Regions:
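N-terminal membrane-entry
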Residues: 1-2
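Structured binding elements
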Residues: 118, 123
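Membrane-proximal cytoplasmic C-terminal regulatory module of class A 7TM GPCRs
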Residues: 143-149
Length: 149
């Protein structure tokens, strides 16, 4: 985890932006437990693997959204309307990743008894992490940059 933090700070040149991404990663851990609860699955060793995978996926989604926002913000002063357009453009990449992940875990939900907790935790967690990246990252960017109307 320390290497992830160091890598994010070096890549983004910002402790605040790395903190935003890491907060999404921490939220994804809770989303994996929500997936276990919704799927009525027991928490065991297989269920322990899901938060680790979700952390990676949520960091990936967050980096994509934040890089699109930073790219646009470096060109000019960005308004809230322009920020929404940037996030909409980034949505395609994130949705593609999330749908392929869900498609991969769908057979495990229905066919596998052993991997069912992992599949439930990852599937619900991926949906939540995607929504978190698309909504939370822009909101935190607005707060940090103090963007007006």
């Amino acid at each position: 985890m320390i290497l992830i933090v160091i890598g994010l700070v070096l890549a983004l040149n910002s402790f605040r932006q790395a903190g935003i991404i890491l907060s999404v990663a921490i939220l994804s851990i809770g989303l994996s437990f929500l997936g276990l609860f919704i799927g009525q699955q027991n928490y065991g060793f297989i269920g322990t693997i899901a938060p680790t995978g979700l952390i990676g996926l949520s960091i990936n989604d967050s980096i994509i959204v934040l890089s699109h926002i930073k790219e646009e913000a470096e060109k000019k002063l960005i308004s809230k309307a322009e920020l929404i357009e940037v996030v909409i453009r980034a949505t395609r990449h994130i949705i593609t990743t999330s749908l392929t992940t869900l498609g991969g875990f769908a057979p495990l939900i229905f066919a596998s008894v052993f991997f069912r907790p992992l599949a439930w935790a990852m599937s619900i967690g991926v949906l939540g992490a995607t929504m978190t990246a698309l909504l939370y990252i822009p909101a935190m960017f607005i707060i940090l940059k103090k963007i007006k109307h």
